[in-house]
Design a protein with these regions (language model features):
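Short, polar N-cap/turn motifs at the start of nucleic acid-interacting alpha helices
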Residues: 105-113, 203, 223-245
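Conserved tyrosine-mediated DNA breakage-rejoining catalytic core shared by Y-recombinases
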Residues: 101-142, 237
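Long, amphipathic, Lys/Arg-enriched alpha-helical "connector/arm" segment
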Residues: 36-80
Length: 260
């Protein structure tokens, strides 16, 4: 991000020199060239965050965590993180900020309409999203429905803002990560032998749900074209480079052809 800001400042500075300087007439209003030796560095490659279908299934299979004695909450942070991770995945990568702020929807509707907080203010279409509630995710949508009707989900009744909500999710994801590592019965060597092309994640982040949705959608099993994934993620860059950052490429289908 800093790189792109500096590149923009350099571009504006160069445009200003072209506009206000006239070398033929000797009129140099902007003599400085602070960016003459500056080179824009290429950003480091973004680490793929997607989890494998196997890890996703393990998250689905996690049972409810025992609540502490005297707890007034009807779910623990681990349960919250599990359910919100699956909500995000099932709703095509909905961000935590949007889960928290999503407006109330028509009672008979099976499509969620909302504006992505991250990009709404920068887009002419206000980053409007239309996501169908599939039968597999409908029980979770119902579980967390806002009883007041103010918003779609009731998370705002438990967490006063995005920071406290994200904090609870991050703590819950850490406990999910610990639980998966404690119960996992397949080590890295066995994964390699089975043809897994991606190591187990160091730590599961909430954004991994969005990356996982994109990666699984583009996998050999589903074969959804990249442009459809690009639109579903609400990306607008014509070259789809942002979408490429989300998708962890798999070569498993090529290995299958080689061994076949």
């Amino acid at each position: 991000r800093d790189r792109s800001y500096l590149a923009c400042v350099r571009h504006i500075h160069n445009l200003a020199k072209q506009e206000f300087n006239d070398e033929e007439l000797g009129v140099i209003r902007i003599p400085q060239s602070p960016f003459k030796t500056y080179k824009v560095k290429q950003p480091p490659k973004v680490k793929k965050r997607a989890v494998s279908p196997d890890i996703l299934q393990q998250i689905i299979n996690l049972g409810d965590e025992p609540r502490r004695a005297g707890s007034i909450s009807d779910f623990t942070r681990r349960d919250l993180a599990r359910d919100c991770f699956l909500l995000s995945f099932g709703l095509a990568g909905m961000n935590a900020a949007d889960l928290l702020s999503c407006p109330a929807q028509p009672l008979d509707g099976d499509v969620i309409v909302y504006n992505r907080q991250k990009t709404a203010s920068r887009r002419e279409d206000e980053a409007e999203m239309h996501i169908r509630i599939e039968p597999q995710i409908a029980p979770l949508v119902e579980k967390f429905k806002d009883p007041t009707g103010a918003r779609l989900f009731r998370f705002h009744l438990h967490y006063r803002d995005g920071n406290t909500f994200n904090g609870a999710l991050n703590q819950g994801l850490k406990r999910i990560d610990d639980a998966l590592r404690a119960t996992r019965d397949v080590d890295q060597h066995q994964n390699d032998a089975a043809g897994e092309d991606r190591p187990l994640p160091e730590h599961i982040t909430f954004y991994a749900a969005r990356h996982s949705w994109a990666t699984i959608a583009r996998s050999a099993a589903l074969k959804i074209d990249k442009y459809t994934v690009h639109e579903a993620l609400n990306h607008v860059d014509a070259d789809m480079k942002i979408t490429d950052r989300y998708i962890a490429v798999s070569y498993t289908h090529l290995r299958a052809h080689e061994t076949g």
